[in-house]
């Protein structure tokens, strides 16, 4: 099992990070809360979870051990796979997710792409007790550092990131169009678009 990887960020394409670890490039899918903290050339430690399926192996990476623990906890819920768990962590930061579960806020959870009412209710029931211990000491991911994107425009990067979370192309375009005039960086556009879609 690969518990964490320490290396240099070689490339970024939301939500995937290519991490150079001693000459070996690892493709790691990350929640946007982690992705938005990374810059090309930066040396980082990513806490990882490896998912092995019959047809593929996929690494998921997180900026801290707590986010990894929550990802693994989400995977234990019936009907929640890695893509949905990543979408939940990308849409709601750790603090907001714990608050949402504690307060039975189904309406917030159903705004996550792919999470319907039944899944949201199941998440509430199965995670309530597990998240009580996480309620203390969670930190908000609201103030994330800027990110440098290599290839596309900030608008295109933001739209691609939202689509990778499961939003339809038209939804992503509308959300980005509504906020793009106020921001120049992709990470800021992504955060603002997600916030507007959660209203």
From Swiss-Prot:
Where found in the cell? Cytoplasm
Stretch list, region Domain II: 64-142
Tagged with keyword ATP-binding: no
Q: Where is this region: Domain III?
A: 150-199
Please provide the record's free-text comment about the domains of this protein: Has three domains with a flexible linker between the domains II and III and assumes an 'L' shape. Domain III is highly mobile and contacts RuvB.
Q: How does it assemble?
A: Homotetramer. Forms an RuvA(8)-RuvB(12)-Holliday junction (HJ) complex. HJ DNA is sandwiched between 2 RuvA tetramers; dsDNA enters through RuvA and exits via RuvB. An RuvB hexamer assembles on each DNA strand where it exits the tetramer. Each RuvB hexamer is contacted by two RuvA subunits (via domain III) on 2 adjacent RuvB subunits; this complex drives branch migration. In the full resolvosome a probable DNA-RuvA(4)-RuvB(12)-RuvC(2) complex forms which resolves the HJ.
Question: What name is this protein filed under?
Answer: Holliday junction branch migration complex subunit RuvA
Taxonomy, top ranks, is: Bacteria, Pseudomonadati, Pseudomonadota, Gammaproteobacteria, Moraxellales
């Amino acid at each position: 099992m690969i518990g964490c990887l320490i290396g240099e960020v070689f490339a970024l394409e939301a939500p995937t990070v290519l991490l150079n670890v001693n000459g070996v490039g690892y493709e790691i899918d990350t929640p946007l809360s982690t992705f938005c903290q990374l810059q090309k050339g930066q040396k980082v430690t990513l806490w990882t979870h490896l998912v092995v399926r019959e047809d593929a192996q996929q690494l998921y990476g997180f900026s801290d051990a707590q986010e990894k623990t929550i990802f693994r906890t989400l995977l234990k819920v019936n009907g929640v796979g890695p893509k949905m768990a990543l979408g939940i962590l990308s849409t709601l930061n750790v603090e907001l997710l714990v608050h949402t579960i504690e307060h039975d806020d189904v309406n917030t959870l159903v705004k996550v792409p792919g999470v319907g009412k039944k899944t949201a209710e199941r998440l509430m029931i199965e995670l309530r007790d597990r998240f009580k211990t996480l309620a203390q000491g969670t930190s908000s991911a609201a103030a994330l550092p800027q990110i440098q994107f290599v290839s596309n425009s900030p608008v295109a990067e933001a739209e691609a990131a939202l689509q990778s979370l499961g939003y339809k192309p038209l939804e992503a375009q509308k959300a980005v169009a509504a906020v793009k005039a106020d921001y120049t960086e992709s990470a800021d556009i992504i955060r603002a678009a997600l916030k507007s879609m959660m209203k």
